[in-house]
Curated annotation (Swiss-Prot):
GO terms for cellular component: ciliary membrane; cilium; recycling endosome. This is G-protein coupled receptor 161. Belongs to the G-protein coupled receptor 1 family. Glycans are attached at residues 2, 6, 12, 97. GO terms for molecular function: G protein-coupled receptor activity. The chain crosses the membrane at residues 28-48, 61-81, 99-119, 140-160, 187-207, 264-284, 301-321. Key negative regulator of Shh signaling during neural tube development. Recruited to primary cilia and acts as a regulator of the PKA-dependent basal repression machinery in Shh signaling by increasing cAMP levels, leading to promote the PKA-dependent processing of gli3 into gli3r and repress the Shh signaling. In presence of shh, it is removed from primary cilia, preventing its activity and allowing activation of the Shh signaling. Required in left/right patterning by modulating Ca(2+) levels in the cells surrounding the Kupffer vesicle. Signal peptide: none annotated. The lineage of its organism: Eukaryota, Metazoa, Chordata, Craniata, Vertebrata.
Length: 526
């Protein structure tokens, strides 16, 4: 008898040690989640707030998402940490109801916002011509307000008797008593979970299908040279044929890489949603159907832990994955080393980026946008990427979704500079690649910066001309006031000489340098 009692005591002590170790592990994990969620969402909110040009309609949804997650990490997760240590609620009934309502509200709004982001990108890809008119900044704000009201409708019933809030020691927090009202559980799952899930599956599925189609024509952000042009340039030359064959192989590899990266990005978005919220929905549905004790405590703890990790994943996927947001964040954090490397160009063109992004959001074609910002000089047919997460391609009727750049920056510069192909880059990327030692470029950039105010008066006419070009094939002269940037200040003499020399060549007249200088002097006197 004494031996059996001693064995039982040893087993109980061992179980106690295991339970204590598990409690410590759970507490440490939730502390790490709380810190990462707070920091991650805070940096995205601050970056978007301090850089207003980043608040495009698409990024307004990201701002709402990260703001709600930041609110959750500050007002709720610290109490979850305390409850995970004590295995009890110590903050009263009122605060229990408040944290339960806050958790349910933020969770519902986050899932619905993810569905809204999917719909926004769906319209950006499939309907690029009407996207800027349909998805405006004001409508994005209205959609966000509706999302919060929609979530509030789904979260208030427990306060009025349809189910209730209670502390669940295995979920570490106060939450809905899912097992008490099957009808409310079914209502909340349908109202706040299934709707965004269906929207994401449909929208991202169509986006990936369009990306596969566009990957056959667009690679590395460049317009693919047509087969006729390639054959005309290779008139029976053996070396040229060999080069063309190798180039075609590289294109095929790039196409496969583009599709793979698009698939990986969509897989990450959907996979994160299903991994963080899927198990939680399954567990609460099981509790509602089979009772409270139908799910083991370890599973309850695990699904709660996964649901909290969504607050860490959202700023990473929808914030830091964005190249522009990431660059601005690095510029804010490492001001001395990162931001001052090209301080003059970045400082003088910060407003240029803001204006150019707004012009791109108006839905104008890339060549017109480039002409507006470049002072009337066409940058060539190609593509232009806006902050809405998609790229305009003039050779295509639809746009390719850029959830993330299909190729890395290194491969972009390597492939897009070969054979003088016209690359598809943003205006910020164009400025980043300008040689820092060229004073003329800085001067021209400053001229553009000073003359941007004159664009507003003629912008409507420019949009009208662009619409005629796109829809009717007509081209009318763009107002000259748009191009006054070239005449505001005198550009360097050698640039004027190059311009005059090119004009004379086009007219069939060859002039020497002395004639060019004399003509330039006459223009200055006039």
């Amino acid at each position: 008898m004494n031996g059996s009692k001693n064995g039982t005591a040893v087993a109980n002590s061992t179980n106690g040690l295991d339970d204590n170790g598990l409690m410590v592990l759970e507490s440490v994990s939730i502390i790490i989640i709380a810190i990462l969620a707070c920091l991650g969402n805070l940096v995205i909110v601050v970056t978007l707030y301090k850089k207003p040009y980043l608040l495009t309609p698409s990024n307004k949804f990201v701002f709402s998402l990260t703001s709600s997650n930041l609110l959750l990490s500050v007002l709720m997760l610290p109490f979850v940490v305390a409850s995970s240590v004590r295995r009890d609620w110590m903050f009263g009934v009122v605060w229990c109801n408040f944290t339960a309502l806050l958790h349910l509200l933020v969770s519902s709004s986050s899932m619905l916002t993810l569905g809204a982001i999917a719909i926004d990108r769906y319209y950006a890809v499939l309907y690029p011509m009407i996207y800027p008119m349909k998805i405006t900044g004001n409508r994005a704000v209205l959609a966000i307000v509706y999302i919060w009201l929609h979530s509030l409708v789904g979260c208030l019933p427990p306060l009025f008797g349809w189910s209730s809030f209670e502390f669940d020691r295995f979920k570490w927090t106060c939450t809905v008593s899912w097992h008490k009202e099957i009808s409310y559980t079914a209502f909340w799952v349908t109202w706040c979970c299934l709707l965004p899930l269906v929207a994401m599956l449909v929208c991202y599925g169509v986006i990936f299908r369009v990306a596969r189609i566009k990957a056959r024509k667009v690679y590395c952000g460049s317009v693919v040279v047509s087969q006729e042009e390639s054959s005309s340039q290779n008139n029976g030359r053996k070396n040229s044929n060999t080069s063309t064959s190798s180039s075609g192989s590289r294109k095929s590899l790039i196409y496969s890489g583009s599709q793979c990266k698009a698939f990986i990005t969509i897989l990450v978005v959907l996979g994160t949603f299903l991994t963080t919220w899927g198990p939680y929905v399954v567990v609460i549905s099981t509790e509602a159907l089979l009772g409270k004790n139908s799910v083991s405590p370890q599973v309850e703890t695990l699904v709660s832990w996964l649901s909290f990790t969504s607050a860490v994943c959202h700023p990473l996927i929808y914030g830091l994955w964005n190249k522009t947001v990431r660059k601005e964040l690095l510029g804010m954090c490492f001001d001395d080393r990162y931001y001052r490397e090209s301080f003059v160009i970045r400082h003088r063109t910060s407003r240029l980026f803001s204006i150019s992004n707004r012009i791109t959001d108006l839905g104008m074609s890339p060549h017109l946008t480039a002409m507006l910002v470049g002072g009337g000089q066409l940058l060539g047919r190609g593509s232009s990427t806006g902050d809405t997460g998609f790229s305009y391609t003039q050779d295509s009727a639809t746009d390719v979704m850029l959830l993330e750049s299909y190729t890395s920056e290194a491969s972009h510069s390597a492939h897009c500079t070969a054979n003088k192909r016209r690359s598809s880059v943003t205006f910020e990327d164009q400025v980043d690649h300008i040689p820092q030692g060229d004073p003329s470029v800085v001067q021209v950039t400053a001229d553009i910066h000073k003359s941007l105010d004159s664009f507003a008066s003629s912008l409507a006419k420019a949009i009208e001309n662009d619409a005629k070009l796109q829809l009717l094939g007509e081209w009318t002269q763009i107002p000259t006031s748009l191009f006054t940037v070239r005449n505001t200040q005198r550009v360097p003499r050698y640039l004027d000489g190059q311009r005059l020399r090119m004009e004379s060549i086009d007219e069939g007249i060859v002039k020497d340098d002395d004639d060019d200088e004399e003509e330039m002097e006459r223009e200055e006197k006039m």
